[in-house]
Swiss-Prot record:
Claim: Transport is one of the keywords in the record: yes
Chain's role: Acts as a ribosome receptor and mediates interaction between the ribosome and the endoplasmic reticulum membrane.
Sites of Phosphothreonine modification: T225, T235, T245, T255
Chain residue ranges for the region called 41 X 10 AA approximate tandem repeats of [TN]-Q-[GSA]-[KRQT]-K-[ATGSV]-[ED]-[GTAS]-[ATIS]-[PQTAS]: 197-604
Keywords: Acetylation, Endoplasmic reticulum, Isopeptide bond, Membrane, Phosphoprotein, Protein transport, Repeat, Translocation, Transmembrane, Transmembrane helix, Transport, Ubl conjugation
Positions of Sequence repeats: 197-206, 207-216, 217-226, 227-236, 237-246, 247-256, 257-266, 267-276, 277-286, 287-296, 297-306, 307-316, 317-326, 327-336, 337-346, 347-356, 357-366, 367-376, 377-386, 387-396, 397-406, 407-416, 417-426, 427-436, 437-446, 447-456, 457-466, 467-476, 477-486, 487-496, 497-506, 507-516, 517-526, 527-534, 535-544, 545-554, 555-564, 565-574, 575-584, 585-594, 595-604
Name this polypeptide is given: Ribosome-binding protein 1
Length: 1410
């Protein structure tokens, strides 16, 4: 029994009420004074009810919050007790990475130059033992001090996600940010250089990327578990690499520099106290940070010019590249920043594993830019030798690399430093979102130092000038970065190179996996990093330079071969992130190929931009640049294939042909080729139309097969239409089912409301009963008092009253119980009915789905049959073509023998033609004679009829006169009075008789003219039937074209609507600020997006997409747009051809209209004349009526005449009106068809434009979905669910757009049907127009008419042939577009599958997190 069921609760409440009422009655009957026990029972009852209600509410809340708790819930490991909470410092960034670290704080000065927009940064509570770092000026004072820190507990931050996988870097200028640095617990005093330095953080555990080796990208490192940042849930992440052990860049930043790196663990700078820490890198011997203090140490790289280490120290070194937004080290913090590049595997910062990674490449997440911020970054790479930053000291060090462009950190200041490399779009580390961080940037593809070495790899960075390996040779050169213990190449000391960073994700280091990681970058060439290669890009000596990384184009080493310094890397580009902005940006840094070297995959490597090292800043590096270009040339593709066509000059060809010997077949073939080239077409080949011509037989067979194919295609179309109808029915039934479900739900809600109302009533009645019980208790008390004081009579009376009240109570309770039971029974019955209806509807829906699947299977079978038929048709065509070739060869052989026969045949044909013309003339003359004889016989008959009518009229007039005389006799008395009037009437009658006779003659003439016109019309109709048939064929061709255009329009509109919806939803999901604009039209919305795009990209919200990815996608979209534009041009040319044909047709129609307008005008003039005469006759008849009112007989006679005249005139006027109406209708139809054609053309152009947009948006959607699949997985924190809901939203949007497209398809089918009906009516009207042409007076000879008709027929045949060709072209284009649409549908299906996989992954994550 379910306690929370409403029915059971109601029963429980009711039962409780009954129990309470029974107790009350019992108390009343026994007159007990146990009021307190009764009240306690009521209180207990209420408490129980409150508990059950509270439990129900709590359970609902728990069910709602389970998912959230499952995502946010994390187990805290607190071996040393809880850490006291402190207010976090405002500028402290947190990088959750390594297990069990105690936090120590090192704060760097934060001079801010330009305004900065910082993404929200999670803060870490500071420990009580933490000490603030001193300024860089105090370095000398605190050089060798070692701060001891008590061990702290791992759970510094339980479930803070420092940066989501899509965190945006929103800096407009670089800025230094104080970092929270945590030394490792129990770190020893002097960690040997080759020992387990902090860089080795998980040396044997395989670098951070391997950290979840099969769980590919580092960001997903423990996919279902808190990301690497949370690397053991709240144990300061390795990114905190000893939570803010100031990165190597800060290496001796204040004092808790890298030396302080593990404050109690002897700073990494002191990393073997005897071996001056890399941070201090032989502090007195100028530390690598100060790498040649007097020589402008690399850190100071031109001290006032912002050394590369400080890379615009106030402007935030490259390390801080994405300052609050998590520097390049944090490059893709979810993807695990470049600093963590192989965090446990010895990050590139640990590049000198014992010697402290190169700046711990983003030690506190300080990116490669900070690569050795105090140590000074890789740019300082040849410090005393004028480090690469100083690459020509006066030429502005690499930090200044483009002085106005501010150091590498500022790589293109406005473009946001390399950290910002993809401006809000995931710093360089995220560059290929955890799939290739900048460390991997081109792991062997020339580390950042080399990034535009100028053409000299970082190892040789100042080749003769102490390469980075020799960086400060006595001071443990950074090249020896692992003092010989692990060269930067071994960056992940054998613990899977940085390249293996996300082993399953193919890290950039593995880019040339067999080419051994960047460290091994030429393993033995430790100092010279690729001494033999010579560029570090040649990463795996035997493997083509990483820049070529399989690109065979050019390695990143030559990244800007002649644009030496990294700052200038793409000086006009600008930022390295934008490294070749026109080409896929470094963020995508080998988007498809994964290597940074492929940075400009389709646009060849940026390094190739100038094959010669032209930079004035690195004159010493020209020779190695040439070597690199040489190595590049080796990998370049060879000469074109030998299979291509060979082009010879004319003279050599003539000489070779003259010297050769041919057989007959070869000579014939040469003749054919030459004749085709010269445009010689031998008409005689095509005149072999005798009965036994095999070509004609084959053509007939081909036509028959084509007819069979057409019938089968029609059957397939019928099956498809049936399928569409069934799909429509399915949609309707689904809508009905949904409506039914909604109704049932509404009913259920109403029932629940009724149940709650019943419960409320029960509670109210319960309260009333309680009140009554209380009243009764009061009465009982009074009665008891009276009993104590009063007599026995009162007691008896009171007992009677008590019994009466008890009976009333029992009755009331029984009535209430019966009512409630009845209501509950009704509600249960209704619920059972509703559930049955739901089950029936669900079964019906399942049956419909089964039917639909069966029909789809049938449709697939039909399509297979059609494909088979098409294949057989192609085979037959090939066989026919072979046969035709054979026949043509035979004709060529027999051509010479038939030369004489041709002349005779031509003469005979001319004679036959002359005979045929004479014969046709004879026939036409005979037909004319016959027609004239018929006309004469008709005229004779008409004359006889006219004479008979005349005699009848005379007899009638005589009878009228006799009647008049009789009337005069009767009115003999009135003769005297009316004699004068009778004389007048007689005179008038005579006049009328004469007029009537004249009218009769005119009527006879009109009848003759009408009959003549009818005869002529019949003749002309017969003649024009043939012309109309030709016009009909032309119209059918036009119809087919229009149908094909409408179909293409429908398909393109479907795609357009679908992709508009998808792109709008995707862009709205990515840029929620555009949600207000989404209500506009799509074109207006795109314009607004273009206008607001730059501002949104400059100032995007925290979870914005990577601008580098978007830029690369835009470039790809531009390329696809260019290809689609070419297709659009083809479509336009074809449409132009069809327009020309339609204009020719229109001109011919207009000419015919003008001819018939003239004829109709003449007919109208005749009609007007006849109308004038009719009006005149009507006037006369009216006069006659007025005069003959006295005599009824005269009236009858005149009315009869009027009726006959009216009949004749009405017939004539009706015919003229019909002709006029038909002509007007034809004009309207022609105008409508023309407007429809223009609309179809405009729509086709729109569709071609919209197809380009659609494909562009599809590519963007694909990339967005792929990025969402890669980057959305690690977001297991509370911020992750919105990212995981995007795929579900996209899926629902796809289904919604598909339903809309089906509706639009049905509407278009209706429109096409209406259009066909309109075309059939136009055909009919044109036929009537032809009849009208015949109606006019054609007095010219019939031979001239026949010649005109022949000319028109020939023109129409030409037009139909041209239209047929255009139709075939359009059909081919339609096929190509259909194939493209099918491909795009496949891509949409793939996207849906990916979305489903992403949903499955998110559900599995929720399960594991719970």
């Amino acid at each position: 029994m379910d306690i929370y069921d409403t029915q059971t609760l109601g029963v429980v409440v009711f039962g409780g009420f009954m129990v309470v009422s029974a107790i009350g009655i019992f108390l009343v009957s026994t007159f007990s004074m146990k009021e307190t026990s009764y009240e306690e029972a009521l209180a207990n009852q209420r408490k129980e009810m409150a508990k059950t209600h509270h439990q129900k509410v709590e359970k609902k809340k728990k069910e709602k919050t389970v998912e959230k708790k499952g995502k946010t819930k994390k187990k805290e490991e607190k071996p040393n007790g809880k850490i006291p909470d402190h207010d976090p410092a405002p500028n402290v960034t947190v990088l959750l990475r390594e297990p069990v670290r105690a936090p120590a704080v090192a704060v760097a000065p934060t001079p801010v130059q330009p305004p900065i927009i910082v993404a929200p940064v999670a803060t870490v509570p500071a420990m009580p033992q933490e000490k603030l770092a001193s300024s860089p000026k105090d370095k000398k004072k605190k050089e060798k001090k070692v701060a001891k820190v008590e061990p702290a507990v791992s759970s510094v931050v339980n479930s803070i996600q420092v940066l989501t996988s899509k965190a945006a870097i929103l800096e407009t200028a670089p800025k230094e940010v104080p970092m929270v640095v945590v030394p490792p617990v129990g770190a020893k005093g002097n960690t040997p250089a080759t020992g387990t330095t902090q860089g080795k953080k998980a040396e044997g555990t395989q670098n951070q990327s391997k950290k979840a080796e099969g769980a590919p990208n580092q960001g997903r490192k423990a996919e279902g578990t808190p990301n690497q940042g949370k690397k053991t849930e709240g144990t300061p992440n390795q990114g905190k690499k000893a939570e803010g052990t100031p990165n190597q860049g800060k290496k001796a930043e204040g004092t808790p520099n890298q030396g302080k790196k593990a404050e109690g663990a002897q700073n990494q700078g002191k990393k073997v106290d005897t071996t001056p820490n890399q941070g201090k890198k032989v502090e007195g011997a100028p530390t690598q940070g100060r790498k040649a203090e007097g020589a402008q140490n690399q850190a100071k790289k031109v001290e006032g010019a912002q050394n590369q280490g400080k890379k615009a120290e106030g402007a935030q070194n490259q390390g801080k590249k994405g300052e609050g937004a998590q520097n390049q080290g944090k490059k893709a913090e979810g993807a695990q920043n470049q600093g963590k590049k192989a965090e446990g595997a010895q990050n590139q910062g640990k590049k000198a594993e014992g010697a402290q990674n190169q700046g711990k490449k983003a030690e506190g997440a300080q990116n490669q830019g900070k690569k050795a911020e105090g140590a000074q970054n890789q740019g300082k790479k040849a410090e005393g030798a004028q480090n690469q930053g100083k690459k020509v000291e006066g030429a502005q060090n690499q930090g200044k690399k483009a002085e106005g462009a501010q150091n590498q950190g500022k790589k293109a200041e406005g473009a946001q430093n390399q950290g910002k490399k993809a401006e809000g779009a995931q710093n360089q580390g995220k560059k290929a979102e955890g799939a290739q961080n900048q460390g991997k940037k081109a792991e062997g593809a020339q580390n950042q130092g080399k990034k535009a070495e100028g053409a000299q790899n970082q190892g040789k960075k100042a080749e003769g000038a102490q390469n980075q390996g020799k960086k400060v040779e006595g001071a443990q050169n950074q090249g020896k970065k692992a003092e010989g213990a692990q060269n930067q190449g071994k960056k992940a000391e054998g613990a899977q190179n940085q390249g293996k960073k996300a082993e399953g994700a193919q890290n950039q280091g593995q880019k040339g996996e067999g080419a051994q990681n960047q460290g091994k970058k030429t393993e033995g060439a430790q100092g010279k990093k690729a001494e033999r290669s010579p560029n570090q890009g040649k990463k795996g000596e035997g493997a083509p330079i990483q820049g070529k990384k399989a690109d065979s184009v050019a390695n990143q080493g030559t990244k800007v071969e002649g644009i030496t310094n990294q700052g200038k890397k793409a000086e006009g580009s600008p930022s390295e992130g934008k490294k070749a902005e026109g080409s896929p940006n470094q963020g995508k840094k080998a988007d498809a190929a994964a290597n940074q070297g492929k940075k400009t995959e389709s646009a060849s490597v940026q390094g190739r931009n100038t094959d010669v090292a032209q930079s004035p800043e690195a004159p010493k590096q020209e020779a190695p640049a040439k070597k690199k270009s040489g190595s590049k040339k080796k990998g370049e593709p060879g000469p074109p294939d030998a299979d291509g066509p060979l082009y010879l000059p004319y003279k050599t060809l003539v000489s070779t042909v003259g010297s050769m010997v041919f057989n007959e077949g070869e000579a014939q073939r040469l003749i054919e080729i030459l004749s085709e080239k010269a445009g010689i077409i031998q008409d005689t080949w095509h005149k072999a139309t005798q009965k036994g011509d095999p070509v004609a037989i084959l053509k007939r067979q081909l036509e028959e097969k084509e007819k069979l194919l057409a019938t089968e295609q029609e059957d397939a179309a019928v099956a498809k239409s049936k399928l569409r109808e069934l799909n429509k029915e399915m949609a309707a039934e689904k809508a009905k089912a949904a409506a039914g479900e909604a109704k049932v739900k509404k009913q259920l809600v109403a029932r629940e409301q009724e149940i709650t109302a019943v419960q409320a009533r029960m509670q109210a009645s319960y309260r009333e009963h309680v009140k009554e019980v209380q009243q009764l208790q009061g009465k009982i008390r009074t009665l008891q008092e009276q009993l104590e004081n009063g007599p026995n009579t009162q007691l008896a009376r009171l007992q009677q009253e008590n019994s009466i009240l008890r009976d009333a109570l029992n009755q009331a309770t029984s009535q209430v119980e019966s009512k409630q039971n009845a209501e509950l029974a009704k509600l249960r019955q209704e619920l059972s009915k509703v559930s049955k209806e739901l089950v029936e509807k669900s079964e019906a829906v399942r049956q419909d789905e089964q039917q639909r699947k069966a029909l789809e299977a049938k449709a697939a079978a039909f399509e297979k049959q059609v494909l088979q038929l098409q294949a057989s048709h192609r085979e037959s065509e090939e066989a026919l073509q072979k046969r035709l070739d054979e026949v043509s060869r035979e004709l060529c052989h027999t051509q010479s023998s038939h030369a004489s026969l041709r002349a005779d045949a031509e003469k005979a044909q001319e004679q036959q033609q002359q005979m045929a013309e004479l014969h046709s003339k004879l026939q036409s003359s005979e037909a004319e004679v016959r027609s004239k004889c018929e006309e004469l016989s008709g005229l004779h008959g008409q004359l006889q009829e006219a004479r008979a009518e005349n005699s009848q009229l005379t007899e009638r007039i005589r009878s009228i006169e006799a009647l008049l005389e009789a009337g005069q006799a009767r009115d003999a008395q009135d003769v005297q009075a009316s004699q004068a009037e009778a004389d007048q009437q007689q005179t008038r009658l005579k006049e009328l008789e004469s007029q009537v006779s004249g009218l009769e003659k005119e009527a006879i003439e009109l009848r003759e003219a009408v009959e003549q016109q009818k005869v002529k019309n019949n003749d002309l109709r017969e003649k024009n039937w043939k012309a109309m048939e030709a016009l009909a064929t032309a119209e059918q061709a036009c119809k087919e074209k229009l149908l094909s255009l409408t179909q293409a329009k429908e398909e393109s509109e479907k795609q357009l609507c679908l992709i508009e919806a998808q792109t709008m939803e995707a862009l709205l999901a990515l840029l929620p600020e555009l949600s207000v604009l989404a209500q506009q039209n799509y074109t207006e919305w795109l314009q607004d997006l273009k206008e607001k795009g730059p501002t949104l990209l400059k100032h995007p919200p925290a979870p914005a997409e990577p601008s580098s990815d978007l830029a690369s996608k835009l470039r790809e979209a531009e390329e696809t747009q260019s290809t689609l534009q070419a297709e659009c041009d083809q479509y336009r040319s074809i449409l132009a051809e069809t327009e020309g044909m339609l204009r020719d047709l229109q001109k011919s129609v207009e000419e015919e209209e003008q001819v018939w307008r003239a004829k109709v005008g003449a007919a109208e003039e005749e009609l007007q004349k006849s109308r004038v005469t009719v009006k005149h006759l009507e006037e006369i008849v009216e006069k006659l009526k007025g005069e003959l009112e006295s005599s009824d007989q005269v009236r009858e006679h005149t009315s009869h005449l009027e009726a006959e005249l009216e009949k004749h005139m009405a017939a004539a006027s009706a015919e003229c009106q019909n002709y006029a109406k038909e002509v007007a209708g034809l004009r309207q139809l022609l105008l409508e068809s023309q407007s429809q054609l223009d609309a179809a053309k405009s729509e086709a152009q729109k569709q071609s434009d919209e197809l380009a947009l659609v494909r562009q948006q599809l590519s963007e959607m694909k990339s967005h979905v792929e990025d969402g699949d890669i980057a959305g997985a690690p977001a297991s924190s509370p911020e992750a669910p919105p990212a995981e809901q995007d795929p579900v939203q996209l899926k629902t949007q796809l289904e919604w757009t598909e339903a809309i497209l089906e509706d639009e398809q049905t509407q278009r089918q209706k429109l096409t049907a209406e259009f066909e009906e309109a075309q059939t009516s136009a055909c009919r009207l044109q036929e009537e127009l032809e009849k009208l042409r015949t109606a006019g007076p054609l007095e010219s000879s019939e031979t001239e008419e026949a010649s005109q008709l022949k000319e028109r027929l020939e023109k129409e045949k030409k037009l139909t042939s041209d239209l047929g060709r255009a139709a075939t072209r359009l059909q081919e284009l339609l096929k190509t577009t259909q194939e493209q649409l099918a491909r795009e549908k496949d891509t949409v299906k793939k996207l849906q599958e990916q979305l489903e996989k992403a949903e499955d992954g998110s559900s599995s994550k929720e399960g594991t997190s719970v």
